[in-house]
Amino acid sequence: MKISIASGKGGTGKTLVATSIAASLAPTGRVAIADCDVEEPNSYLFFPDRVLLERKECHVAVPVIEEEKCTHCGRCAEVCAYHALAVLPQTVLLFPELCHGCGACSIICPEKAISESSRSIGEIFLARSPGVELVWGELALGEARTTPLIKAVKERAEGDTV
């Protein structure tokens, strides 16, 4: 079973409700709480006896342009749905905060001048408190892309739990 506490004004008690439900179901031993507020997670603070089990970086794919191979044809910028690339006469500009890591630019490049690298956008944490598994993510300072980190938190929390 999944119970979601979502979409409310800040300070209304979403975290309090979620952690209270988790704590009340803890005796079943099959409770996981996924704090998807990756900009300011705090559900783990309600479980002071937690033990940190895992801390893992979350990465997204980003293009790397090999300038010496690039002919500045502009196909990469044309195919980019998020306008993360701008082709100028002498260079290609990448706006990493706009890039969604789809890889279309590297596929379309006729010169094979675009490869992919990865960039850390934050961390995922896994902890355990008696009867409760806690999963949360912390977005790196200055990072704008919350969606991939939220997705990683949700994937990590999947299982036979409430």
PLM regions with names:
Residues M1-P27:
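Walker A (P-loop) phosphate-binding motif
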Residues C36-V38, P110, W136-R145, A152-V162:
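Switch II (G3) loop of P-loop NTPases
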Residues V64-H83, L93-A113:
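Cysteine-centered iron-sulfur cluster-binding motifs in ferredoxin-type domains/subunits
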Residues F95, G122-L134:
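Conserved Radical SAM active-site core
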Residues L16-V17, V38, T71, R75, ...:
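Conserved active-site and cofactor/substrate-binding residues in soluble primary-metabolism enzymes
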Residues G29-Y44, S117-E123:
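Short beta-strand-centered segment that lines the nucleotide-binding/catalytic pocket of NTP-utilizing
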Residues E39-V60, L126-R128:
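P-loop NTPase switch/communication element
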Residues V87-L88, E116-S117:
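Short beta-strand "wing" residues that participate in macromolecule-binding interfaces
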